[in-house]
From Swiss-Prot:
Protein name as catalogued: Ribonuclease HIII
Keywords, sorted A to Z: Cytoplasm, Endonuclease, Hydrolase, Magnesium, Metal-binding, Nuclease
Superkingdom assignment: Bacteria
Reaction(s) catalysed by this chain's protein: Endonucleolytic cleavage to 5'-phosphomonoester
Source species of the chain: Streptococcus pneumoniae (strain 70585)
Gene of this entry: rnhC
One CC-aspect GO term: ribonuclease H2 complex
Length: 293
């Protein structure tokens, strides 16, 4: 039976209780504040602030607090560089790529901090732990602004080759800082064949072999850290761009983005949209059609 112990913030505890309030059950243990019987798991919230999750579904419910089980592989126990990117699926905001160097002796610290794939963490949790990660973990962060993105896409780069360039540059710059990884892992966004093809046009190269692995953020803590820092960088950029234009820019590429894009287009024209959005997305044409109604 899986057993996970966490010490989340009181705010996260209250959010969890609100979400699963129908599963609250009585407990005779005087040290348990709240007890929940959930499908495939029980959750005990102690007066000390600790939470004990038990059962087959423990990991699922622990992910609410940012916990992610990291697969134990031989590669995990090596000094390792891992990279990930955030923003490639969002119409608004730039493209953030981060490379991180993590050694095995840092694993316990990272797990206690609650590091997992940024997709499983709330934005609030990401903003909370990123300053600590940036201070303690060697990394290299790059941000391609929307305006620069629009400048290079369709000219020298496409949506895939620009990510190859950024991942390569982040790793290259991190290696220049003197780190010595025994393995380099990229959270796969294309095939190894494609990656090598686009890499050939990059000037800055290194001899270290790389490995492209799907869902690497769940296998390697270095990739998970990169995912978190990249998400924070993307969110900060999204906020700053929106503040300059006077709009709250949504993440993603849904109808909310179409609506805000049409408003920006009406207020500032294509120049304003180019400042904050990736123009080759279909949202641009959808925003134009909204103005024609």
């Amino acid at each position: 039976m899986a057993s996970i112990t966490l010490t989340p913030s009181e705010k996260d505890i209250q959010a969890f209780l609100e979400h699963y309030q129908t599963s609250l059950a009585p407990s005779k243990n005087p040290y348990i504040r709240y007890f929940l019987k959930l499908p495939q798991a029980t959750v005990s919230i102690y007066t000390s602030g600790k939470i004990l999750l038990q059962g087959e579904g423990a990991e699922k419910y622990a992910s609410f607090f940012g916990y992610q089980a990291v697969e134990q592989t031989s590669g995990q126990n090596l000094p390792l560089i891992g990279t990930d990117e955030v923003g490639n699926g969002s119409y608004f905001g730039g493209l953030a790529v981060v490379a991180t160097f993590v050694t095995p002796d840092q694993h316990d610290f990272l797990r206690k901090l609650g590091v997992g794939d940024s997709k499983t963490l709330t934005d609030q949790k990401i903003r909370q732990i990123t300053p600590i990660l940036k201070e303690k973990i060697q990394h290299q962060a790059l941000l391609l602004s929307p305006s620069k993105y629009n400048e290079v896409i369709g000219d020298r780069y496409n949506a895939v080759s620009v990510k190859v360039a950024l991942h390569n540059q982040a790793i290259y710059l991190l290696l220049q800082k003197g780190v010595q990884p025994e393995k380099i892992v990229i959270d796969a966004f294309t095939s190894a064949k494609n990656y090598d093809k686009y890499l050939a046009q990059e000037a800055n190269r290194f001899s270290n072999p790389i490995s492209l692995e799907e869902k690497a953020e769940g296998k390697y803590l270095s990739v998970a850290v990169s995912s978190v820092i990249a998400r924070d960088l993307f969110l900060e950029n999204l906020e700053n761009l929106g503040r300059e234009l006077g709009y709250q820019l949504p993440s993603g590429a849904g109808t909310a983005s179409d609506k805000v894009a049409s408003q920006i287009l009406q207020a500032y024209g294509m120049q304003g949209l180019s400042f904050c959005a990736k123009l080759h997305f279909k949202n641009t044409e959808k925003a134009k059609k909204r103005l024609e109604r």
